[in-house]
Amino acid sequence: MELRFPRFSQGLAQDPTTRRIWFGIATAHDFESHDDITEERLYQNIFASHFGQLAIIFLWTSGNLFHVAWQGNFESWIQDPLHVRPIAHAIWDPHFGQPAVEAFTRGGAAGPVNIAYSGVYQWWYTIGLRTNEDLYTGALFLLFLSTLSLIGGWLHLQPKWKPSLSWFKNAESRLNHHLSGLFGVSSLAWTGHLVHVAIPASRGEYVRWNNFLDVLPYPQGLGPLLTGQWNLYAQNPDSSNHLFGTTQGAGTAILTLLGGFHPQTQSLWLTDIAHHHLAIAFIFLIAGHMYRTNFGIGHSIKDLLEAHTPPGGRLGRGHKGLYDTINNSIHFQLGLALASLGVITSLVAQHMYSLPSYAFIAQDFTTQAALYTHHQYIAGFIMTGAFAHGAIFFIRDYNPEQNEDNVLARMLDHKEAIISHLSWASLFLGFHTLGLYVHNDVMLAFGTPEKQILIEPIFAQWIQSAHGKTTYGFDILLSSTSGPAFNAGRTLWLPGWLNAVNENSNSLFLTIGPGDFLVHHAIALGLHTTTLILVKGALDARGSKLMPDKKDFGYSFPCDGPGRGGTCDISAWDAFYLAVFWMLNTIGWVTFYWHWKHITLWQGNVSQFNESSTYLMGWLRDYLWLNSSQLINGYNPFGMNSLSVWAWMFLFGHLVWATGFMFLISWRGYWQELIETLAWAHERTPLANLIRWRDKPVALSIVQARLVGLAHFSVGYIFTYAAFLIASTSGKFG
């Protein structure tokens, strides 16, 4: 018999309909469901695929370096980072007429190019790269790593090199190696790079392999380290009039705690960053020696978990049984990893703009907006994925006997209380926030803006004041010059920090008012509702009062037939599906808020945000409509301009988004009838009927159509906003 796709499922391969293709694609990565899978092979397959993932990442980053070196303007950008537009790569399109060629030829290029809004120029400049040759070297090195990763992946699929199951289940060794090796050593190596290459480069000293051993990063070398006078490394830092990349105003310190920003670049002091990475390295190198392996010393994670019984016994058996539950469930481990990574990615979004670490990136407004939005969307997808795999864990891997009365079992026991509290919080936030917005809308519409309900966010302002913001006059903690907190840090980082917090030209602790109060609560509504849907999906994944045997139906099922009413749309997959819409809408509010507040800050008219953000019409008119006007003007009677591509993408994004509803708001029978009619017509049409298909065409399943609809909705939503964001920001600020 001929081998047909999918090879991993003979049952599916023999399906006579097009279901074979779609279900084959859908389950290609669900290794657990494949024929002849064993637990050991499952782990080996996933392990080998990690090498492929690394290869793709290295190839991609290599491509970035290569194209900028080949077609970019890195060397001329370095001469004037604030006015030269960084080029990502050249573009060639046979459709371009002369107006298009002229519109897209910028940044000092000879032909049409794309401008880089990713921040790579600022990053490479900060870490000490200075020439195209440096970029080519980096590209080749990453290409080498990519090849190495592919070889590693292939190697670990060979019988002699396949790790055993016991190797994968050795949690302590893995933790030690990842903490010390991955985080500790890499942070130490990065500190080394910053101290030996990046900091000298910021002071006009070009360190490469040929002079690496001759140039001391600090005049006294290792002397202060060996004699215990570590504070010497912080003496003589760069002065406030230091010109980045030159010797003018440069100091000699390598590890400092200055606080605040470099006045010229508006980014964190490189010597502060090096100090931070050294501290991280120190912590992780210690952490990576904590767990017991072959040597009989250190902690056993299992013992740690078993020992933690809650006091008084009222909270059950604590963490007993958790070690084996987590160690034997890939979905649990993936859920934990995704939850952590999702939070970290969102934190990256928040910190990249408020505490920028790359030189001059804070003044590249479009890049700031693009990076914030990019990281928040990625965080949203990763976090919803965490709950999806949490639900799969409960369906496939959870063993009630192993987890009797521990924290997992008690979560399931108390799920009604958890879900109803989340529901109450969501309802409260939703009705009150919408009520305030709508009230304010009506007041504006009737010409009585003074009757708006405007609430000052006094608690948030108090927190900002505690961190040193003096605008509000709270006179507390770091904003009080007489307090112990103020005096303790006065000789170290505090002056730099206070200067940064109270200088209104950066994004650190922006002044907030009633508009911020409302939008924060709108975002809180979105976060709580998304969480409600995800938590309910996971906690009800095994069963509910309505459907106690739900776990027997798997992760994604449409319904249990017509005989059991009400069993449609309640699979754990359906909860994930619904949560993604809420996640996207929530991040929409987050990014609208961030972008509008920053546009008014950058333009110097913060009063526009403050006055218009307290009612919905203000958001629709003064943010969305006002800022999309240039976008809609991408093509006009006078020809085209450099925003035309974004105008096209804006339209295309709407098209993709709207297409999603065709899959979301229709039923399977309609499509089945349509397909059969089209197949009938095809078979009776001359010439066309020469083309035959082996698989009988059938409509997508309900779950698949939902996935296709969700994918279109998500992609269209993000494309539309990306075009709006980049065009409206670059149209104003270049």
Swiss-Prot record:
It catalyses: reduced [plastocyanin] + hnu + oxidized [2Fe-2S]-[ferredoxin] = oxidized [plastocyanin] + reduced [2Fe-2S]-[ferredoxin]. Phylloquinone binds at residue 671. GO terms for molecular function: 4 iron, 4 sulfur cluster binding; chlorophyll binding; electron transfer activity; magnesium ion binding; oxidoreductase activity. The chain crosses the membrane at residues 46-69, 135-158, 175-199, 273-291, 330-353, 369-395, 417-439, 517-535, 575-596, 643-665, 707-727. Its EC number is 1.97.1.12. Chlorophyll a B3 binds at residues 662, 670. Chlorophyll a B1 binds at residue 654. GO terms for biological process: photosynthesis. The PsaA/B heterodimer binds the P700 chlorophyll special pair and subsequent electron acceptors. PSI consists of a core antenna complex that captures photons, and an electron transfer chain that converts photonic excitation into a charge separation. The eukaryotic PSI reaction center is composed of at least 11 subunits. PsaA and PsaB bind P700, the primary electron donor of photosystem I (PSI), as well as the electron acceptors A0, A1 and FX. PSI is a plastocyanin-ferredoxin oxidoreductase, converting photonic excitation into a charge separation, which transfers an electron from the donor P700 chlorophyll pair to the spectroscopically characterized acceptors A0, A1, FX, FA and FB in turn. Oxidized P700 is reduced on the lumenal side of the thylakoid membrane by plastocyanin. This is Photosystem I P700 chlorophyll a apoprotein A2. It comes from Oryza sativa subsp. indica (Rice). The gene is psaB.
